[in-house]
């Protein structure tokens, strides 16, 4: 497994050390709770960490960042690690209904020395969170994600949703139920994938 350096990732040495601690924790916990697939674990930095960093790099400023279905911490905890130095004013909430994965997220945040609230609830049971920034990766299709955005994204806020090669079809399907504006940013790690930056979500 290739591990990049701080310069390659364009992060400080302190942030890079936190990312390495996090990567080690994923390797330690993964055999027990399957945070990522065994195959993608071998390419953890490119498939998951760098993929999450590009979400952070495309985010606007905001006081509250909510990551839905955080799972193994991608992108939520990775973004929180970068924000600790680069956007210290931003608060992070990770929502994860699986109690074991929530325990991992809390442990990882503590060991990486970052502030991140972990909520162990199903997303649909939560009161509106009023997020400035909303992210979710590999959670559900875009139609479902926009339903979460309508409830939890502040008016004027931005949703950041990484999507795979079928993203255009997901956009077409979502447009049948939702009005929204979007910008599709080509992924650095997968040429056919994009990061969707979405604003102005309302029902059709």
UniProtKB/Swiss-Prot annotation:
<feature type="binding site">
    <location>
        <position position="74"/>
    </location>
    <ligand>
        <name>S-adenosyl-L-methionine</name>
    </ligand>
</feature>
<dbReference type="Pfam" id="PF02527">
    <property type="entry name" value="GidB"/>
</dbReference>
<feature type="binding site">
    <location>
        <position position="69"/>
    </location>
    <ligand>
        <name>S-adenosyl-L-methionine</name>
    </ligand>
</feature>
<keyword id="KW-0949">S-adenosyl-L-methionine</keyword>
<protein>
    <recommendedName>
        <fullName>Ribosomal RNA small subunit methyltransferase G</fullName>
        <ecNumber>2.1.1.170</ecNumber>
    </recommendedName>
</protein>
<dbReference type="GO" id="GO:0070043">
    <property type="term" value="F:rRNA (guanine-N7-)-methyltransferase activity"/>
</dbReference>
<feature type="binding site">
    <location>
        <position position="137"/>
    </location>
    <ligand>
        <name>S-adenosyl-L-methionine</name>
    </ligand>
</feature>
<feature type="binding site">
    <location>
        <begin position="123"/>
        <end position="124"/>
    </location>
    <ligand>
        <name>S-adenosyl-L-methionine</name>
    </ligand>
</feature>
<dbReference type="GO" id="GO:0005829">
    <property type="term" value="C:cytosol"/>
</dbReference>
<comment type="function">
    <text>Specifically methylates the N7 position of guanine in position 527 of 16S rRNA.</text>
</comment>
<keyword id="KW-0963">Cytoplasm</keyword>
<dbReference type="InterPro" id="IPR029063">
    <property type="entry name" value="SAM-dependent_MTases_sf"/>
</dbReference>
<keyword id="KW-0698">rRNA processing</keyword>
<comment type="similarity">
    <text>Belongs to the methyltransferase superfamily. RNA methyltransferase RsmG family.</text>
</comment>
<keyword id="KW-0489">Methyltransferase</keyword>
<keyword id="KW-0808">Transferase</keyword>
<dbReference type="InterPro" id="IPR003682">
    <property type="entry name" value="rRNA_ssu_MeTfrase_G"/>
</dbReference>
């Amino acid at each position: 497994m290739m591990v990049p350096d701080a310069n390659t990732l364009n992060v400080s040495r302190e942030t890079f050390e936190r990312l390495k601690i996090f990567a080690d924790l994923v390797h330690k916990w993964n055999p027990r709770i399957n945070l990522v697939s065994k195959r993608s674990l071998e390419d953890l930095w490119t498939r998951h960490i760098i993929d999450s960093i590009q979400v952070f790099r495309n985010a606007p400023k905001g006081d509250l960042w909510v990551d839905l279905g955080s799972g193994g911490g991608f992108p939520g905890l990775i973004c929180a690690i970068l924000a600790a130095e680069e956007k210290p004013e931003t608060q992070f909430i990770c929502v994860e209904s699986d109690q074991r994965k929530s325990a991992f997220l809390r442990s990882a945040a503590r060991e990486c020395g970052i502030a991140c609230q972990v909520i162990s609830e199903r997303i649909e049971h939560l009161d509106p969170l009023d997020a400035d920034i909303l992210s979710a990766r590999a959670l559900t299709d875009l139609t479902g994600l926009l339903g979460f955005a309508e409830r939890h994204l502040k008016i004027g806020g931005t949703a950041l949703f990484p999507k795979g090669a079928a993203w255009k079809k997901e956009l077409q399907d979502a447009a049948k139920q939702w009005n929204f504006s979007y910008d599709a940013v080509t992924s650095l790690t997968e040429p056919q994938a994009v990061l969707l930056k979405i604003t102005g979500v309302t029902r059709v």
